Amino acid sequence: MKVTVENKKGLNKDIKVFIDKETMNSYMDEKYEEIKKTVNLKGFRPGKVPKEVLKRQFGQAIFSEVLDKVLKDTSVKALEDNKIKPAGQPKLDLKTYGEDKDLEYVMSITELPKVELKSVENIKFDEYSVKIDTNETDKRIKEIAKSQNNFKEVAADVRAVEENLVIFDYKATIDGKDFTGGEGKNTQLILGKDLFIKGFDKQLIGVKKNDEKSVDVTLPENYPQKEYANKKANFICKITEVKKSEEVKIDDVFAKNLGAKDLADLKVLVSKQINDEYKNSLDKLAKTQILKEIENFKVDEIPENLIEEEVKILSQGMTEEDSKKSRKNFEEIAKKRIKVGLILNEFGEQNKIKVTEQEVQAEVQKQLRMMPGQEKMVMEFYQKNPSALASLRGTVYEEKIIDLIKTKAKPSKKEISKEEAEKILKEHQKQDHNHEHDHNHDHDHPEEKKASKSTKIEKKPKPSASKKPSTKKVSKK
């Protein structure tokens, strides 16, 4: 194989590859020998079909298969031997090819630019620890206790008030006619939360057991059966039970039920949990600071093809007119994203950072925990969307790079109060929409839902740099 590299304008190169016909014929002979072992042709014993017969029967198909393999193998080798990293898929132009002929082709590529890695020890970022006072811990424990309240049935003549649990059967009609989904049994509502159809539960205030109550509402715009959306409906509700919540006593027994040794231990765990909530959000802010610092590193030139691909991603879902108006802004965002991505990749390669299959699966499991009850849907999504799984792998890779940078850099360590943390995060949230740092472009994730109350201890979400912290179980480290 002969390879000639011709430099074009900027990062563009033409790589000419020549393979003589003797080498091509040896590839063909290997393939014929491979096929001869398995092919069955009338009049010939298995493994004894002559090459000329195979050539007449399968020659064109075999050559196409061999050509694909040779192009793949030789193009990769040509790039590796010349230490060329392409930005995107190379374009192949076949000049000469065919059975019993030389193979000659030109591979046109845009090369990844040279990246100058500064010493990461110079990167500056803030590392916060949040001091949580006892009042905040006690407040959170009370909220947890409230979420654990038990409901006990009240006397048949007691009328329902806000925060009571009402259980009922219903039959609904639109313009006096039954409709799909208009019937329910043992429906449960906590009055005052307005979690069913808007304005529904307040009409049940004052009902008692065995009452029949008529409720008029307008079905929501996102009603599952679209033909009924925004229509007025009448619900005839048969009240089967009214229950009142009983406060849970906050003591050692309560703490043990939540997995703690005693109440004192629970306070330690909850305090740590609150601190972790803020830490997770503040860590995202630190990541943003690091990425902003990396923007100051030098990259000779940004490949135009990568900019174009990134602009297409940013323009997804927009009209052609809006896309044109935003073009200049999108190009600037694209250049920043690509530049930082190139630098992170170079840092990752130099430090031999790898992502294992176990780490990818751990990230998938993290996604599953965020969407309880929809685990099957999430798994199927990743199985059917390899690009989404690749994006997830990219997320893990970037996080490992950022974590390593944090260990090498010298952070400015600061202890702050909860109020100061909220102020910092709020300020960052205001600026967040102006700073794009999502280098993995995770456009393929399934729609996320908030975690349900399936864990023993529920967190109260706090403000964060980009979104509220997720619900997690309190655990000891």
Curated annotation (Swiss-Prot):
The gene is tig. Its EC number is 5.2.1.8. This is Trigger factor. The keyword Cell division applies. Residues 408-477 are annotated as: Disordered. Residues 408-461 have a biased composition (Basic and acidic residues). GO terms for biological process: 'de novo' cotranslational protein folding; cell division; chaperone-mediated protein folding; protein transport; protein unfolding. Involved in protein export. Acts as a chaperone by maintaining the newly synthesized protein in an open conformation. Functions as a peptidyl-prolyl cis-trans isomerase. It is found in: Cytoplasm.
